[in-house]
Amino acid sequence: MPSQTSSKTYPAGSIWRKWDLHIHSPASVFRNDFAGATQEEKWRNYFTKLATLTDISVLGITDYFSVEGYLKVIREGNLTNVNLILPNVELRILPVTGSNTAINLHIIFNPSVVEDLENKFFSSLTCSYAGDSYKCTRSDLIKLGRKYRNSELLAEAAAYRDGVEQFKTTITELRDIFSKNKTLAENSIVIVSNRSGDGNSGIQHSSLAATREEIYRFAHCIFSSNPSDVSFFLGLGTDSKKEVMRKYGSLKPCVHGCDAHDLDSIGKPCIKRGKENHNCATAADCEMRFSWIKADPTFEGLKQIIYEPEERVRIQEHSPYDDKRKVFFESVSLTGSTNFILPSTDLFLNRELVTVIGGRGSGKSVLLESLAFLNEEHLKVDRNGKKKVIEFYRDNDSHSEPPPSFLLKTTLVDKDGSKQAFQKTLNEREGLELPFLYLGQEQLSGMATNDEELTKTICELIGIDAAELNQQELIVEAREVLAQIKVDEKTAADIVEAFKKLGYRDGEDLEKWTEQYLKKLSAQQARLSSKETREALTEINEKTQRGIKLKGLVAEADLVLVTLEKLDANETLKTLEKKINALYPDIKLSPVDSKKQVQEIKAFQEKANSEMELLRSEIRVKKAELIKKGIKEDVNTLLQSSEAIQRQISSVGTDLENYRIAQKAIASGKASRNALMQRIRNSLNRLNDHISAKFVEFQGSRDDSSAEEKELFEKMIAGIGIEGQVVFDDRELCKQLLSWRVDNRKIPSESDLRKHIAGQQPDGTPKGLTLDNVIGWVKADLGGSKVFNRGGEEGTLDYILTEWPDFLKVKAVVRLNGKPIEVLSIGQRGTLLLKVYLSTSTVRQVFIIDQPEDNLDNNFIMNDLVPLVLKTKKSRQIIMSTHNANLVVNADAEQVIVAQLDVGKPYLAGSIENPEINRSIRDILEGGEEAFRKRQRKYHEGVG
């Protein structure tokens, strides 16, 4: 018998294909409506019809209590248009349904055990009748038919038909057979019909409810195309998944076939068949419900629907790929590899989850880096600055001859199905801008260990700018306000100094002092305003001035007299005359006589002194008259004109007004200063609210997307929260103020400074220092106490108002499930970052991720990362290298690429169900066996 254990491999992995697992053949003993005058003609027509099928990958040839029709198709059908033919044995089991019909139960066997079915399965099935026991073999079924008809002469074909019709088995018997033969059990898939007529749902009596549940529990799958059945057995209907698993042992996938008993029905699983006025042979309005199974067309592929009943099978007319069109890489090839670490490679890629596995140095990461290289997004250096693979070979650091080279090609399929080819050589350094997001191995693990970098990256990805507050604008304004206050304070201080020269003293009330001073000037001006006073003052002034002049002349005359008295001019003249006579004897010099001049000078002095005495007497008289009028000031002061006094009054008044203006400006400036503190806080609060609002905006950013895309997005961001938080670093503020601004003799410690700003508790400890305390302290002019060093008060205000970013910040607080980043484990941080990366990518982007599980614990991978990947791959292609079995097995990777460069072998690609791939997963990945056990337990109660 030809082998049906296909040796063909499917390197692109699990893809959606049509499977029709319920097609009867001319060997059927019931409803053999296949066209043909003879049995041979029926078979010829049947084979011809099967050969015309163009888009069905797997056929299930169905026989009642045998595999006779299947064997004939295998031996004689010569079908090259299908990938696999499976034997489907249809049984009748008790109890009967409400329509008094036995329940249809199907068992699909692995072709590898077909040769053993006669001895190990059919011979083990028995049926008792009239005191005799019959096996489910052809010879015994003929005997049963003849016994039932009570005719040993009944024709063999008729007897066989009657025997098959009367043969019934039970779940108990089938369970016993499979329990005794593990190989048979492992190579069989039990499917129960759910039709009310001949299916398990036809058992309606409440007394048989447990029996009905037990039949479902025994079955792996349900034959039904009813959407309500599909939902119910997946735990998406009236019963929860947990309840379905409790009742029936596992979630059950539904499959559907054409159940063809005639040629026209083959490959046409139309649910309108049999309805009035509908003929599947001619009607164009057939409603087809094909079974689409995402798996290799192998028996192991079919078993995958048991482990992933919700994701591996669909019942619908069109391909599931049409439901979720996506951008994906269809292939990647590296040709002309010269002195490069990767040999020439050609890989088809699955459009869903592609996982790359392998040992250290096997080539799994370099394959992903080569894809990232297309966009120049590959990592150039590692954390230590060492060149990564692509750059090492690109720069020929190994000095190879000829230099390393290759041509990397890829085919990108767009959502509309159009394809575009791209290529790039090793030496080209310009990215192709292909739609993918690449996350290198060190990107996730590196950021996950740095709180600040992780928060910054997450905020940037989401579009939150925690630096949007215009700090510089506020700081410049603060400097202007403080500078103006300083100018106004200097103006006021200069005016005070001017008043001090007029008699003002520190501590006096300046307003009162100027009031008194101006009154004094006004009174003086009033006294000087009468004619008599002005004439008296003028006369005194004139006499005083004359007296001063006389006094000066008398003093000058005294000097001349002294000179004349000391002058011995005649002796000098005689000496000179002698010298002249020596030359001119006839010349004579007359003697000098100064007595007359002396007398004249003394006469002048006597007259002047007499006049001065008279002037003094007259001045005394005039002053006495003024004193009587109450005028006691110095004459010079009194002699100032009324206009001069008025000018002084105006000057003092102007200075006072300027002082008042300066004081108002100072008060206004301080109000602006205080308001600026509040504005700084308000700005921080606005930024705080901005951060929170931006995250809310991000949460709603997919509101206009499809329901499915929105649901995926919500799953991705589930548990993530970002909010703003104003951070007041009171320790930094205290540190800066204590460094030089405050007088450490008066405030020696941080505790003392806190008490000075915020106050103290009853026990003497400082109260908590808050931003409100600081704002209040500034408003109170820093407490008005002398606790600062020289320039310290000004420096403190300047620091608080212009260097506040040192101690005041707005921080974005990122949380996962309510916990801030700071308390998350490395694994939780990595998952958080990955969730954000995935949720912020565009719908067109392919995800290329290198070992995302690094630093993640297995529980976290299973509970968080695996569900995330399962959801994401529905709308995005994911290409991911990993050494974690759960990310391959329990994320149900559609394609596994085994990297084997370390042992000198090329890449091996295929599905999880591919035996060679399956072995590699178990051998290479730590926890591979356990991962498969978890997968089996996921939707099955009590599977260990």
Describe the predicted segments one by one.
Residues 1-56, 67-124, 195-361:
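Charged catalytic cores and adjacent phosphate/nucleic-acid-binding surfaces used
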Residues 421-497:
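Extended, charged alpha-helical "arm/stalk" segments used for dimerization and assembly
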Residues 391-443:
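Nucleotide-state sensing region of NTPase/ATPase domains
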Residues 253, 286-333, 686, 693, ...:
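Pre-NBD coupling/linker segments of ABC/ABC-like ATPases
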Residues 403, 422-426, 862-944:
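C-terminal lobe/lid and adjacent interdomain/linker elements of RecA-like ASCE P-loop ATPase modules
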Residues 59-62, 110-111, 350-389, 830-839, ...:
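Phosphate-binding glycine-rich loops of NTP-binding sites
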Residues 348-365, 440, 812-836, 852-860:
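Conserved ABC ATPase signature
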Residues 487, 494, 501-823, 829, ...:
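Extended, charged coiled-coil "arm/hinge" scaffolds of SMC/Rad50-like chromosome-maintenance ATPases
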